[in-house]
């Protein structure tokens, strides 16, 4: 089978992956990470950590003995406290597609994130964070019936966790960047002040313009700051403009076709 090297199935919010370390002794991966950050800082480079707080590597009891469940992350401690659940107490994959969406109605789950950010900032020395599917951190599952999916999907700009993270960033002089969408919604421009946001509108408009799609007005709007979408919660200085990322095709492929063909082999 294929090896999962993507890095988006978080097992622990506090530990670097031992597989990437040369020194695999007790504490070795942590020491190496700290040394790496120090070396980058000495060269004048900041380090931003891509963090996945929307789900964990928690699995289920499928694909094996149905009477046996393996706990790999938070499920063995207090699954009902950390995870969104259906009325029948099954894990939810709605916003993440991973069957283990975290529940940020829970103060315990909120504190876990804040403690993790403190650890990576104070102990490991990173300069900022990019939050994968950050909209999950702005939802309040417990404010709706467990089967009321319309209300489950609501996003709260003033969510206490989003506000606390922005305050933490200001206090520690670090940057926090949201991937401001998930499978339940697109919230670019809606994060509170103190957050920067990946701008998917900029990405899409520039890609289309480069291909000659004729979207000149849209292109000019995003290149000039996307003011219409960022005016309310901090202004266009919040937008993180990008064209390509780890998800999807590389930049050369993006401008080398006329019609999409996702079935073509690599």
How does the language model describe each region?
Residues 142, 147-152, 156-266:
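Conserved alpha/beta catalytic core and glycan-binding cleft of carbohydrate-active enzymes
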Residues 1-125, 130-165:
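Substrate-binding/active-site clefts of carbohydrate-active enzymes
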């Amino acid at each position: 089978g294929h090896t999962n090297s993507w890095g988006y199935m978080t097992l622990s919010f506090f530990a670097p992956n031992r597989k990437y370390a040369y020194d695999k002794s007790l504490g070795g991966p942590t020491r190496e990470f700290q040394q790496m950050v120090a070396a980058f800082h000495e060269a004048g480079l900041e380090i931003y950590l891509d963090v996945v707080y929307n789900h964990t590597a928690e699995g289920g009891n499928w694909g094996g003995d149905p009477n046996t469940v393996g706990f790999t992350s938070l499920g063995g401690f207090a699954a009902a406290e950390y995870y969104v659940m259906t009325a029948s107490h099954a894990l939810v994959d709605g916003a993440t597609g991973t069957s283990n969406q975290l529940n940020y109605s829970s103060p315990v789950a909120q504190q876990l994130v804040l403690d993790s950010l403190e650890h990576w900032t104070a102990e490991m020395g990173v300069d900022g964070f990019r939050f994968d599917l950050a909209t999950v951190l702005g939802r309040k599952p417990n404010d709706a019936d467990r089967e009321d999916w319309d209300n489950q999907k609501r996003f709260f700009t003033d969510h206490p966790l989003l506000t606390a993270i922005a305050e933490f960033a200001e206090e520690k002089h670090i940057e926090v960047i949201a991937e401001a969408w998930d499978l339940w919604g697109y919230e670019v421009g809606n994060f509170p002040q103190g957050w920067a946001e990946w701008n998917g509108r900029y990405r899409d408009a520039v890609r289309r313009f480069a291909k000659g799609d004729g979207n000149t007005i849209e292109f000019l709007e995003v290149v000039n700051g996307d003011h219409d979408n960022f005016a309310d919660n901090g202004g266009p200085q919040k937008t993180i403009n990008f064209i390509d990322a780890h998800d999807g095709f590389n930049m050369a492929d993006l401008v080398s076709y006329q019609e999409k063909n996702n079935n073509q082999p690599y």
